[in-house]
Amino acid sequence: MKTIILTLLAVVCLTTTAQTTAVKEHVDPLLTTEWGQDAPYNLLCPEKPNSQGEPQHCRVGCVACAMGQVMNFHQYPAVGIGQGTNIFNTSLTVNYGDTHYDWAHMQDSYRDAYTDEEATAVATLLYHCGVAVNMIYGLQSSSTFTAFANNMTTALVRYFGYDDTDLKSVSRSKYTRAEWLQLIYENLSAGQPIIYSGNSSSMGGHTWVLDGYDREGRVHMNWGWLGRDNGYYDIDLNIPGLDFNQQQSMVIGIRPPHTDTGIVRTTAAPAADVVWHTLDGRTVVRPVRRGIYISNGKKYVIH
């Protein structure tokens, strides 16, 4: 069963972006992850008794899965900020400020064999995302209020230190189709995946990631279903089984804070003889996966 989102529409929508970005002809999918909501992703989520009375981990929740995949793309932060408690279950408290996020051990896919360290790395991130957005955990589905006071935008800034300059939640009802697509293309051209939500009359709500678009203007969607159905779609989603085309909204402007060193965006790492570091200071021989790396005082976003 897909995760249900209890959507409140009290979102503040701005009609312009603070930053103008040149729109590219197309953007190849930015994400390499194909994550989901069950094991190992949910190994740190709370347990509830199943139909046999045995303890079972709740599902991650699609909001947390989408947030986690976007954060993994940015490989940020190295360490969280402060402490947070789930208002719907006050026994769920996370000390973000004491958590080092182990990006190096988060795998793009967990279909094949993986280590305990790799499982813990992704499970920690996704559980922390869930607590940050006040996830209501369940065995069949985990849900949250996408426009709640402590929603995704608040969580990204408060607990994970993302730049709040252009970060906002916007509702499609405030835009024409052309304006909406322009926002999408601008963010993706800037290397900023989008967290997207919509409702279906037959399946409830879902939150997923937009991470690219093709030359025909179709948007690449990562649904958070272990790679299933990932592909290019018209934004109107008039597709049986994927018709999350009601009350669409999105979180745009998701990026780490600017630094004085600047950021260089590239599709491949420069020469192999330079020294590379991850954001948390580990030395790597050469970046072999997408993410953010530091070399000679500059940050490189490898696409």
Per-segment meaning from a language model:
Residues 1-23, 134, 138-139, 156:
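Bacterial Sec-dependent N-terminal signal peptides
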Residues 19-145, 214:
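Active-site-adjacent structural segments surrounding the nucleophilic cysteine of cysteine proteases
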Residues 58, 63-70, 148, 152-156, ...:
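Stable alpha-helical elements in mature extracytoplasmic
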Residues 134, 138, 148-150, 159-163:
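Serine endopeptidase catalytic core focused on the charge-relay Asp
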Residues 154, 158-222, 258:
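Active-site-adjacent substructure of cysteine-protease-like catalytic cores
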Residues 216-235:
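Catalytic Cys-His active-site segments of thiol-dependent hydrolases/isopeptidases
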Residues 242-280:
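Residue-level detector of functionally pivotal "anchor" positions at catalytic/ligand-binding pockets or at interdomain
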Residues 264-303:
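C-terminal outer-membrane/trafficking sorting elements
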